């Protein structure tokens, strides 16, 4: 049987049962109706529980604007400073660094950061962060914290349109998401490799099915029913291409054999919100290994794959329920990717 459309191979549950779930962030308030800070740590690749570790840190919290008579949309009454009012929720990715302290010290240092926020626009809408009051616990991330940071607004803010342009805005950290990295590295497939198209190849893509602890339909993320009749979500990632000698036919059995030899293990992390980590513990073909820069661990941040889905579920519980390998013929080389809605060189449209 040759592959002309798509074929599916379902991985055994043992490939994701150990590290395929994320606990939710608890949103609790104290007697003063202030949100109680919390740190959540996920371990990828068997890192040490204490002592020197490599941590990827992702801050979550609320945007707060200066109060005035005018009213803007707000998401909560969880006010910290009476002169400021919550106007949205969002995040601040800090990245990976080596950390030697304990979790609670890191949480305390993060909640004491003085973060000013500005909304602007370049090629896309951006959020600008300026950070002061950096405690020693956060010095490993100081190279980013001491400089202004810009991020795509649709990746770090749930509702960027609610951030006013004529008032001061602060970002108040409530939650700290950490991914502790052991022997696993944070390798991300380069965009040039992800867009690679070669003749006589089969594209191996992964479809990851997840369930979450919140209702997402009202937030524009429609859940579907799985084979058990339960609501679930899914997203896709690209693993790479496999190639046969010219004239040899691809079969479903051949592709399944290739993927089974790789012995893939799947984990969920908190890089950029929610992230998928794939670890190849078996043998990899030379063609595919070269596309992966001969790395065996790949990180797929949902922030880059599906920003809106990431924004909706990044604080909730997430659990992998199924992973499928999708075998699809590689797109012909003459197909072109159009990232811009306006096509260049067509009619009266000028480049």
UniProtKB/Swiss-Prot annotation:
Sorted alphabetically, the keyword list is: Viral envelope protein, Viral matrix protein, Virion
- Has the keyword Transmembrane been applied to this entry? no
InterPro entries per the record? Matrix_C, Matrix_N, Matrix_Paramyxo_C, Matrix_Paramyxo_N
Cellular compartment(s): Virion
The domain of life is Viruses
GO terms classed as biological process = virion assembly
Q: What's any one GO cellular component for it? A: viral envelope
Q: Name the Gene3D superfamilies on file.
A: Viral matrix protein, C-terminal domain, Viral matrix protein, N-terminal domain
Q: Does the keyword Glycoprotein apply?
A: no
List GO molecular-function terms, semicolon-separated.
Answer: structural constituent of virion
The protein's role, per its UniProt record: Plays a crucial role in virus assembly and interacts with the RNP complex as well as with the viral membrane.
What's this protein's family per the entry? Belongs to the morbillivirus/respirovirus/rubulavirus M protein family.
* Protein name (database record): Matrix protein
List the source organism: Bovine parainfluenza 3 virus (BPIV-3)
